[in-house]
């Protein structure tokens, strides 16, 4: 190694950090981890890894409780929640907020934030949304997918076409030219920007800044 860390901290999923448990240098650094715990129960192998860390943090009380219920010898320190930024506060006027984004103020939007990967059940999501629309017959309900396309996962145009959702699926676009974010119906991976009119608007997923999405 070109450096000798005293503390190694991992804030990521188990499969991205478990190798450090087996590191030949493990005895020479303090290992602090903050694993993503969003389901219960956790895989026992994951719990064994968490139990070997010197310090363990959680994103939420749910994560803390899940880990400690499965192993009460984990060196748990505290819940380290994200900063309480006003970016995450609800919009004061939802109808006006929708209007500012060019969306019908009376619309009902069901949203999801997840990367377009094969393990994410986008086909099930869109098929279920189609059934919901058929049952409710409500013209003002839309599915908002904050994700990436194209990516390593699903073929969005195919899923939308198969389920007849061309006018019901909204996505986040970000312009490479003016850097502004907009929300629009899925048309293609690239389209004209609503702000600067350049043909450089592309679907932007998890990396779009929260402040930009709020704008």
Where are these regions (language model features)?
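Proline-centered loop/turn at the N-terminus of a beta-strand
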Residues: 28-32, 55, 75-76, 108, ...
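Donor nucleotide-sugar binding/catalytic pocket of nucleotide-sugar-dependent glycosyltransferases
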Residues: 52-93, 170-174
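Conserved donor-binding/catalytic core segment of Leloir-type glycosyltransferases
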Residues: 104-120, 126, 143-144
């Amino acid at each position: 190694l070109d450096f000798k860390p005293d503390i190694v901290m991992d804030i990521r999923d188990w499969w991205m950090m478990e190798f450090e448990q087996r590191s030949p240098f493990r005895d020479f650094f303090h290992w602090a981890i903050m694993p993503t715990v969003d389901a219960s129960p956790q895989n026992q192998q994951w719990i064994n890894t968490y139990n070997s860390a010197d310090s363990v943090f959680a994103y939420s009380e749910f994560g803390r409780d899940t880990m400690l219920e499965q192993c009460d010898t984990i060196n748990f320190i505290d819940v380290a929640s994200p900063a309480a930024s006003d970016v995450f506060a609800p919009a004061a006027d939802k109808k006006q907020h929708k209007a500012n984004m060019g969306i019908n103020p009376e619309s009902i939007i069901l949203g999801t934030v997840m990367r377009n990967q094969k393990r994410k059940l986008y086909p099930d999501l869109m098929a279920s949304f189609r059934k919901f629309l058929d049952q409710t017959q409500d013209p003002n309900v839309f599915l908002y997918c904050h994700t990436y396309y194209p990516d390593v996962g699903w073929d969005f145009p195919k899923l939308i076409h198969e389920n007849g959702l061309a006018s019901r699926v909204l996505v986040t676009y970000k312009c490479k030219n003016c850097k502004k974010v907009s929300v629009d119906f899925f048309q293609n991976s690239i389209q004209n920007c609503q702000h600067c009119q350049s043909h450089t608007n592309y679907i932007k997923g998890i990396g779009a800044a929260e402040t930009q999405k709020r704008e």
